[in-house]
């Protein structure tokens, strides 16, 4: 019977990819318990769906039948589509849906599904850094650059190193870079608790006491400061479309802009006059669209950076007013320039930039003249024009989100003003909703270039509107747009590279790093679908794949009106953008914060590759952990010490252990200690030397092994409800394995590095053998130098017979006694982790 159940579950997990004509699209990241949860059923043939099932992924049992189904008709090649609403179900766990003949991928429902996702996006921002690039551990474009279009400085050198490359190319624009900075500052301002510290200011691994998003903001503002070297002198762009020569590492970029190969790039001055656009001229009419962005970033940056970099904060504070005043004196748009083609960012609006600059100056200075000016600018463009439109030129109305309306509406003490700008925000949302209601994905975003950036903008506007008003009228569309980005779309793919790592995501983004086999564009948001008419009009598009991997053209799923391809040669739909990626940080951090509120806790754990490796470092607690597969000769000694001092511990066992060491398991459970899974078969998941490059097990093998372990654990009353923490076999894993664990509703945990306690299993014949005295000494050295707050301290319940120096016999008692005397408290992981 056991084998039949396992076979049935394996079929269920793979059926969604094998079924000939029906699929269920879901958010691959999962869902918060108290949130809108709607999947989309699609079928190539006509299908009648009146109900659907929610199935427990661990047991294969249906936990609820739903009849909350809405027929949304045909869509593209799909003759039948339905929206499947299961929002009323809130129990934590791992599930999949069944409707018709389709089975969805597995997904979790829990309060921490978005934890770490905003920080994950910063991987791409670090990868895009110009100057020193931490991803490559090398520097690029060190000689930027030479001034263009300045009345007296043209041809002179200017130091504008730093910032971020815009996308798959290496151009740099103030327009997109400033928007990226502001979006990250908004995210940090509104949700500071959602950001961690794992990297230093240069983007290298290692905490520096400053949240990583603040490090990234500072990196951007340093560059923006250089792009404004003197009062009234502002620059709009570095390099131009001559950059589009080939895929190459930025370190080896030798494009010649007329100054010699790789010896410097043009830096375009904000002249306020038309500049080159291929054979023509761009439509520049002033500088306010750019200097307004300088103003908002400098003003908000002065507030955000003051606790970390007070001198620099004061410097940009003084610059903010000058940037704004320059825009007042030279109103109009400052478009980008091109040389070889007519491709530019065709921004035509500028009052939104001045509105945001003015309101941020008001918040910085308290001077009411800035608020009055912000209101006047805001009234000139009450709604961002793309919202509700069918099309737009490339970056015609930018930024895609006008945060100025939100900031004005947030000003305390003026209800009339707040109501006016809330109405403006609602108008844009309402127009988008009107276009969305007939779509099975509730998707009303125009499929123009960078449609995913527009999607992100609308999600953010919906969330900001709901935050101001509490109005839930548009919450289902907000959820649909959120879910669109993570797989609830016609193609069933996430639009964020490697998020979730164990899911379906862009594997061939249009990036030189991918083409040159340097790595993936991790964390990057790709452009997203475009209208078929746009795609068919583009030059140089190639749907061929990489030499070592086939592309995914999704031919079977392409709607008639739009296309998306996971192919490195498709720069229109599969190129990650720096500004789009940064714009995810607000809504992702907000979702993490909402999850914390639902859980009633703040996540202060430290993570590595998706696994918790340390609990709250501000708490003087230790989670003592013992793992075991076959050896357990130390059980009596360990339990004797724990009983002697009345401390709790945590135990992770394999299926083999549960089946053969039942009396030990029962003794531990009787004590009230945490008991969790260490896998069933103690499989080796990864290549230990290259953990992220090679995974030895498939997703199905991993899940089947875990389910088998929980089936055995169930005999002891241990279920996912009371044992959701999982420690991998050999204490080795990668981000893919952690992602698979997340899908199953598990939280992967591992020991805290630094003490060497896990070496208590080593035997004298090994080169890396460590004796118990040395291990104890290393633990106490770490305690003395860095403290053990929040440590997950790993030991083994048994070791090979060749090891006669058993730590639990000789030093465990001393270790526990000493740490207790130093004021540490031994806790269960459930208490220490906090969720």
Predicted regions mapped to residue ranges:
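Bacterial Sec-dependent N-terminal signal peptides
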Residues: 1-21
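Aromatic-lined, polymer-binding surfaces characteristic
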Residues: 291, 295-305, 313-363, 392-409
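Active-site beta->alpha N-cap acidic-glycine motif
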Residues: 602-687, 692-693, 708-724, 834
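Acidic, glycine-anchored loop motifs typical of Ca2+
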Residues: 202-213
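N-terminal carbohydrate-binding/catalytic regions of secreted carbohydrate-active enzymes
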Residues: 36-67, 72-76, 99, 307, ...
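Carboxylate/His-rich catalytic cores and anion/metal-binding grooves
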Residues: 213-238
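Aromatic (Trp/Tyr) and acidic
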Residues: 28-100, 105, 111, 126-179, ...
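Catalytic domains of cell-wall/extracellular-matrix polysaccharide-remodeling enzymes
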Residues: 637, 659-663, 684-794, 798-825, ...
